[in-house]
Design a protein with these regions (language model features):
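Short beta-strand segments enriched in small/hydrophobic residues
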Residues: 1-14, 23, 68, 127-131
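Periplasmic-binding protein-like
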Residues: 56-70, 89-90, 129-130, 180-196, ...
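Beta-alpha junction/loop-to-helix N-cap segments that form part of ligand/metal-binding clefts
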Residues: 14-15, 29-95
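Extracellular/periplasmic periplasmic-binding protein-like sensory domains
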Residues: 200-276
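Short beta-strand elements in bilobed, periplasmic/extracellular small-molecule ligand-binding domains
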Residues: 28-44, 99-101, 150-166
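Solvent-exposed, acidic/polar segments of extracytosolic/periplasmic ligand-binding ectodomains
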Residues: 311-376
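An alpha-beta-alpha
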Residues: 105-161
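Extracytoplasmic "Venus flytrap"
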Residues: 1-17, 40-44, 269-273
C-alpha cells in the first residue's frame, strides 16, 4: 500500500520497487510460502488509506506492507487493530508509538535523529533553524531534535512549518538568511523538500554564500531518488542520517543494487525506504513459514526469531518493541546523485522508540549510537 502518485510519489515508488523485488525473490525461491502481492495506491489521501485498509482487511488479507508518512500510518492503525491484521511499516519515523498490530522495519529516532545531532554539534555548529511539513513527522522530529541539541548546549533559533506540497519558500528562506544559523534541519517531505533545496541553493548563490559549507541542510529523510528530483545543480553537500545508502560497499548491497537496477531500469533508484520495504517482505515470508498461518499473533511471535542479512547489514526485530535493530549512518550527498558515507555504527543498534535509554527527559545520560569514521 504505497502512494505511487501524489506529493511523495517518488519515494513511495522506490518503496514499492523494494517490496516487489522481495516478492519476486520469494517466488523464484519456490519455498513453502508463496506470496501473491495485491498493490493498492492511496495517492497520498488519508481517507483513501483508511478505505483501502478496510477493504483489504475486510477481504481477509491480514498482512499489509505499506505507508510512508506518519499521518497515513496513524490513520490506518485502528483498522488493523480492529481486524487483528499486521501492518509492516517500512519507513523511518518519529517514534513514541507501539501497537501489537505493527511491525516497524524503518529507523527509530535513536537510530537517525540522535546520531545526526551528535554529528552536527561536534562538526558543524550549535544553532539550528528547523523547517518542516506541517504534520506529525516534522512536529515530533523537531521536538526530539530540539531536546537533543539543547542537551548538547545548542539551540533551535526558529521553526517554520508549511503544508505538504507547498513550494513557496521566499519568506522562510529570507528568515534563514537573516538569522544565519549554523545549519538548517529539514523535515519537509516530497515536492516541498525538492523545491526548498533548489530555492535555498539559488538564494544563497545570489548572496555569495557557499550554501553547502556555510549553511548546510541536514535531514533524516533525504534519499537517492529525491536527489534526482532536486536536480538543478542543488543536490550536493547535503547531510542525511539514514540506516542505508545505496553506495554502501558490501557484497550484500552490491548484489541488491545489481538485482534492483535490472528489475527496475526506469527507476526510481533504491533508497533507505526501498530497502526497509524489501526487509519487511523478506521478514514477512520467513515469519509466515515459521508460523504456519497468516494470523497476526503467531506471525508477530515468529518475526522476533528471524535474522536477515540485508543490504545494510544484519537486521532483526526486537521482541519487546517490534522495531528493527538497524545500523545508523551519516552521509553527504554528491553531485553524482549518491551519498558519501561519513560515519557509521560498528554494529546494529537496538531500537529505542520511546527514547527511554537515550533521552535526558528521563534523567538518563543521553546515549546515541557510537559511529566510526568511514575511510574513503
Amino acid at each position: 500500500m504505497f502512494s505511487t502518485t501524489g506529493p511523495y510519489s517518488v519515494v513511495a515508488r522506490s518503496m514499492l520497487n523494494g517490496a516487489m523485488l522481495a516478492f519476486r525473490e520469494n517466488a523464484e525461491a519456490a519455498g513453502p510460502v508463496v506470496l501473491e502481492p495485491i498493490v493498492v495506491n492511496p495517492s497520498g489521501d488519508l481517507a483513501r488509506y483508511r478505505a483501502l485498509s478496510l477493504e483489504l482487511l475486510g477481504a481477509g488479507i491480514r498482512q499489509v506492507v505499506g505507508c510512508y508518512t506518519s499521518s497515513s500510518r496513524k490513520e490506518v492503525i485502528p483498522c488493523f487493530e480492529k481486524f487483528d491484521g499486521l501492518l509492516w511499516y517500512p519507513s523511518h519515523y518519529e517514534g513514541f508509538e507501539s501497537s501489537d498490530n505493527v511491525i516497524y522495519t524503518g529507523a527509530s529516532p535513536n537510530q537517525h535523529v540522535l546520531p545526526l545531532v551528535d554529528y552536527l554539534a561536534s562538526r558543524v555548529g550549535y544553532r539550528a533553524f528547523c523547517v518542516g511539513s506541517n504534520y506529525i513527522w516534522a512536529w515530533e522530529n523537531n521536538r526530539i531534535f530540539r531536546e537533543a541539541l539543547t542537551a548538547r548546549g545548542g539551540s533551535v533559533i526558529a521553526e517554520r512549518y508549511l503544508s505538504v506540497g507547498d513550494t513557496e519558500f521566499d519568506q522562510v528562506i529570507s528568515a534563514i538568511l537573516d538569522q544565519r544559523p549554523d545549519f538548517v534541519f529539514n523535515n519537509l517531505i516530497g515536492t516541498s523538500a525538492y523545491a526548498f533545496f533548489r530555492a535555498f541553493r539559488a538564494a544563497c548563490k545570489v548572496r555569495g554564500i557557499d550554501q553547502a559549507n556555510d549553511i548546510p541542510v541536514a535531514s533524516c529523510t533525504l534519499s537517492e531518488p529525491e536527489l534526482a528530483e532536486i536536480g538543478g545543480g542543488a543536490i550536493d553537500g547535503h547531510l542525511s542520517s539514514s540506516v542505508y545508502f545505496s553506495s554502501l560497499n558490501s557484497p550484500p548491497n552490491a548484489a541488491f543494487i545489481e538485482t534492483y537496477a535490472k528489475a527496475f531500469p526506469d527507476g526510481p533508484v533504491s533508497s533507505a525506504d526501498a530497502e526497509a520495504s524489501y526487509i519487511a517482505v523478506k521478514l514477512l515470508a520467513a515469519s509466515l513459514e515459521q508460523a504456519g498461518t497468516d494470523d497476526a499473533r503467531p506471525v508477530r511471535a515468529a518475526v522476533a526469531n528471524q535474522r536477515l542479512l540485508a543490504p545494510q547489514g544484519e537486521v532483526r526485530i526486537d521482541p519487546q518493541t517490534y522495531h528493527a535493530w538497524l545500523t545508523p549512518r551519516i552521509g553527504r550527498s554528491a553531485a553524482n546523485g549518491q551519498f558519501e558515507v561519513l560515519l557509521e555504527a560498528r554494529s546494529p543498534v537496538a531500537p529505542d522508540p520511546y527514547l527511554v535509554q537515550s533521552s535526558p527527559r528521563f534523567a538518563v545520560t543521553m546515549r546515541s549510537p557510537v559511529l566510526r569514521v568511514v575511510q574513503s
